[in-house]
């Protein structure tokens, strides 16, 4: 890609890295780390703005890209690196300040109103995916106010796909996460007294002929979801 970008300056090229902090990024980038500093318009002429401020020596790369093994290797101005990362995830590497300062970062809001299927109903219930997740996330934050990792346990807008709202998939994917992770220390915060184990939750949810969520959630939690559903319906009617 570096060679293509170098030879085609009229077009933009993007290297996309998913979950950047899943690995030891500085170690993975190696000497390329130095190329992340780009020339600023306040300090360099227009024709140089955007390219790497500092070059590195790499004979093999230089020969392939420039045809000259002694040519300093730089990222051209028409090549950008885009990366995603979950700063709340506990099972990742911490990125040091020196590495992070070389990036322009943007916080992505976990807004269920932007989810394509937030208004889709969870199979066998009277509750939509967006309403369910919003109520649960509020409870996760409230019950983990003294824990830095509470955001890590929240449901993201892409946590469950539309097909995973089906009864046989929802319990195994979403309810399992709530039992095993989000409310691991005290599942009774959201699950009713008849659910003594995850097996009970899955079994009752999948076999219930009534509202499936009502069969496993605490009454006050379920009613909170119904109330939010009612409020959203009123808001939609007013629009």
Which residues fall in each region the model found?
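C-terminal regulatory/interaction module of P-loop NTP-utilizing enzymes
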Residues: 1-239
């Amino acid at each position: 890609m570096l060679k293509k970008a170098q030879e085609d300056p009229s077009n933009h090229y993007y290297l996309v890295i998913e979950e950047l902090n899943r690995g030891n990024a500085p170690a993975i980038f190696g000497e390329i780390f130095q190329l992340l500093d780009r020339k600023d318009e306040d300090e360099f002429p227009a024709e140089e703005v955007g390219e790497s401020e500092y070059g590195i020596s790499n004979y093999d790369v230089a020969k392939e890209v420039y045809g000259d093994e002694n040519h300093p290797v730089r990222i051209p101005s028409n090549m950008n690196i885009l990366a995603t990362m979950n700063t709340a995830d506990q099972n990742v590497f911490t990125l040091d300040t020196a590495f992070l300062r070389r990036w322009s970062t943007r916080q992505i809001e976990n807004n269920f109103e932007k989810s394509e299927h937030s208004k889709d109903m969870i199979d066998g219930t009277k509750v939509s995916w967006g309403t369910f997740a919003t109520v649960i996330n509020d409870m996760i934050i409230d019950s983990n106010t003294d824990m830095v990792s509470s955001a890590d346990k929240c449901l993201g807008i892409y946590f469950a796909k539309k097909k995973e709202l089906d009864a046989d998939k929802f319990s195994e994917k979403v309810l399992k996460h709530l039992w095993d992770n989000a409310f691991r220390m005290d599942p009774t915060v959201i699950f009713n007294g008849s659910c003594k184990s995850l097996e009970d939750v899955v079994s009752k949810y999948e076999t219930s002929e009534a509202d499936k969520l009502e069969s496993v959630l605490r009454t006050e939690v379920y009613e909170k979801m119904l109330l939010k559903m009612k409020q959203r319906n009123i808001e939609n009617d007013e629009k």
